[in-house]
Every structure is written in structure tokens, then in C-alpha cells.
Amino acid sequence: MAAEVPTFKLVLVGDGGTGKTTFVKRHLTGEFEKKYIATIGVEVHPLAFYTNFGEIKFDVWDTAGQEKFGGLRDGYYINAQCGIIMFDVTSRITYKNVPNWHRDLVRVCENIPIVLCGNKVDVKERKVKAKTITFHRKKNLQYYDISAKSNYNFEKPFLWLARKLAGNPQLDFVASPALAPPEVQVDEQLMQQYQQEMERATALPLPDEDDADL
């Protein structure tokens, strides 16, 4: 009998239009096997990753756009074991709303590992710069710049969460999942520049005022 694959419920939250559905749909098997839960209006995408300790699966709960009509129901968050909060680096308001998403999530699921992702870094008109992104440091979250449409850093949030959930920093992905072909290309030099800016910003002390520079 095949061993049971460790499976974790992952809630994906953030303002409408930040690219959450685009992001989760990059993983082709998850997109093929997704299930719709009509009672709470959610699509669940089972995303499998292969690690040096065997297969791991994230059941990614995607809101199917409900967040545009106000907050999400508790049923969405209940029993979540990890989370991704997404904002759009070309839209300041989506970053400004991150604390609300975080508050709703931790109110229901207290001590779960959470990754904050700034999506759309492929777009040249970046509005939310590295020095502004401090929320993850205040709340002990992990942060990654991502670009769903180019697959840039797609695996990073999942690898960080998998290590946290397994309690093993040595865990690694040994094979890449089948991803949809990139719709856009990222500028590698610009990505390196963003990464350096993020490293420099992380070395600075946190501002006293809450998000005074927003």
C-alpha cells in the first residue's frame, strides 16, 4: 500500500487583483486536479512537490474572487496549517491592506507559518519598494518578491513553508513541478538589484512609526 502523502491546508489571501489565482494556476497538476467547494465558494488546488524526504502536498485554498465583496468567512481559514498573503508591488493599497489579511488569518489560525509575497515584480513600474516592505519583519513572516506570470520564485514560498512544517531546514525540492510556460520574462539584472535592495533594507532598523513611509 502506498504511504500517505503529508498534505497541508494552505490559505492564499490578499486583495482582489493581486494575482493569487494566476499564481496557483501555474502549477499544472494542481490546476488539473482542483476541486470547487460550492458551500464556501473556494477552489482547492492540490499542489504536489517532491522533496529529498518524499512527496509533500499543499491543498491551496483560493478564494475565487470573494474578497472583492468584503472579508472572508471563518470557514475559509479553519484548520489552515500555513498561509500565503499576496500583494501587488505595482499597487500601494494592496500592501497597505496586508495587516488586515494577516489579522484575519491569525485570529483563526494562531501560530501557523506565513509567507508574504509581493507579486508582479516583472512590471517595470514598481510602486512598493524594498524599504517600504517591513510588515513581515514585525510579524516574523518570510518575504519573497515573485512574478506569477514568469514563474519567478514560484517554488520559494512553498519550500520555506515545507521546511517549517516538516521542522527540517535540510528539506529540499528534488524535482521541479510542471509549470505553465512563462507569459512574460523577468529582467534578471533587475531581479538581482531588487534582491540586493531587500537585503540592505532588512539590515536597517525597523521604523518606529507604523508604515510611515506608505
Swiss-Prot record:
Question: What's the main place this protein lives?
Answer: nucleus
Give residues annotated as binding GTP. 15-22, 65, 119-122, 147-149
Q: Localized where?
A: Nucleus
* Annotated region described as Switch-II, given as residue ranges: 65-81
**Do you know which InterPro entries this protein is assigned to?**
P-loop_NTPase, Ran_GTPase, Small_GTP-bd, Small_GTPase
Does the keyword section mention Cell wall biogenesis/degradation?
Answer: no
Pfam family membership, one: Ras
Q: Which residues form the Small GTPase Ran-type domain?
A: 4-168
The GO terms describing molecular function are: GTP binding; GTPase activity
In the UniProt record, does the keyword Nucleotide-binding occur?
A: yes
Q: GO cellular component annotations, sorted alphabetically?
A: cytoplasm; nucleus
Q: Which PANTHER family match?
A: GTP-BINDING NUCLEAR PROTEIN RAN, RAN GTPASE
Q: Which family does it belong to?
A: Belongs to the small GTPase superfamily. Ran family.
What does the UniProt record say this protein does? Answer: GTP-binding protein involved in nucleocytoplasmic transport. Required for the import of protein into the nucleus and also for RNA export. Involved in chromatin condensation and control of cell cycle.
Q: What is this protein called?
A: GTP-binding nuclear protein GSP1/Ran
According to its UniProt entry, this protein's organism is Eremothecium gossypii (strain ATCC 10895 / CBS 109.51 / FGSC 9923 / NRRL Y-1056)
